[in-house]
């Protein structure tokens, strides 16, 4: 299972996270938090959220440093 980015349209932090993942060459699956009731209840105030195997790696403001630290685990 790869990375999953839980995001929403119109979210500037989400757009920044998408750009950072793309710049780092990290492939991910996009899931719209507003399209799924479970995701909405769990993550609506936490987006963007990056998951790996169902585990939260990052949420909120993504930075290159935070992303590098989390991906090296």
Language model features with spans:
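Short conserved loop adjoining the S-adenosyl-L-methionine
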Residues: 40
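Local sequence-structure signature of Cys/Sec-based thiol-disulfide redox active-site neighborhoods
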Residues: 1-24
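Surface-exposed interaction regions that form or flank ligand-binding interfaces
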Residues: 43
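Small/polar loops that bind or transfer phosphate-bearing groups
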Residues: 6, 31, 59
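Thiol-based oxidoreductase modules, predominantly thioredoxin-like and allied folds used
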Residues: 27-37
